[in-house]
Amino acid sequence: MSAEIICVGTELLLGDILNGNAQYLAQQLAQLGIPHYHQTVVGDNPDRIKQVIEIAISRANILIFTGGLGPTPDDLTCETIADFFGSPLVESPEIIEDITQKFAQRGRVMTPSNRKQALIPQGADILPNPTGTAPGIIWEPRPDMTIFTFPGVPSEMHRMWQETAVPFLKNQGWGQEIIYSRSLKFWGIGESALAEKVTAYLNLPNPTVAPYAGKGEVRLRVSAKAPSEVAAEALIAPVEKQIKDIAGLDFYGVNHDSLASVVGELLRSSGETLSVAESCTGGLLGQMLTEISGSSDYFWGGVISYDNSVKAGLLGVNPEDLDKLGAVSDTVAEQMAIGVKTRLSTTWALSITGIAGPNGGTETKPVGLVYIGLAGPGDEVTSFKYNFGTMRDRSFIRHLSACTALDLLRRRLLTR
């Protein structure tokens, strides 16, 4: 017994609209413990919709459709489903009355095209839409097969799912077990290297462990099936602890943790402060830090020293070093960190200087070369050299630079 999500809409295929409905429904199915192995996006074409249904019924017992329930000619979901299963469409007086009242409440008269939304397969139950004019259906066209249809408007679909579909599914016995997941996050290690370290855990039956790469980071999704979230967490906890022990400092957080939030909590707990000096990241590091509510407890501010005159004038970088070594060098990175730490009187300081591209690289200093400075209590200062590669774009290099700077400080705070 499993479910399949089928999202109908050419606008989804063209990328005009982000398919948030599939994400929402996938999360909801997990909360009900309903297995879910496939999602499909298909355009507003009856033949292709039928092809998708043909495949879906061979591997799933619950089909959940979103989109294609409107009044226009290209809204074909309901009639195509009915045609596939050989069922006639019947007009629902209840739906006609509901649509008529909604138009009247808005001071309008229902258009003839809206009558199309009242056509449902014979024998289907209405899935009421409290806010819009597009109702859905719950239909069992054959034994051991249930079909749900929802409008594509997310707010309407969410409410209809919660108020009608969830009670129906729970009445069918679903929801007695849930699928609960925790996302373990890692920085400073590649996906393949991490997978090799935790290979013994990748074939566990319950909880399951699966690696996937994010934007510069790696995640392990640990999922358990259990009667409750508490029971699932009890299954996950020992596996999570063992993986953390194996990964060491490469592990940095779970679920919605970010490097900025983790660093922030470490600084807050120690009563210490941070400032930043940025060149190639242009304020991105400061933005990451200030996205965290309450970051003013530990983040004093920063200097965007894009031009060398600012590096020298505001941060006290030696002009001779700038001329001789260039702005992208370990010496300049260290002086930037010392300068902003001194100027803002903070415990710690981070600096970033590099070549984000796509222009500006040379044979000796290619695009992707970045130096990160870290200044700490007393006279502590050091720098780190990274080459993030010439094949990555400007945005990604800046992102890697800012996150790596946060990770360096995180590791320093944890190992002092």
From Swiss-Prot:
Superkingdom of the source species: Bacteria
Q: Which SMART domains match?
A: MoCF_biosynth (SM00852)
Q: Where is the signal peptide?
A: none
**What family is reported?**
Belongs to the CinA family.
What name does the UniProt record give this protein?
Answer: CinA-like protein
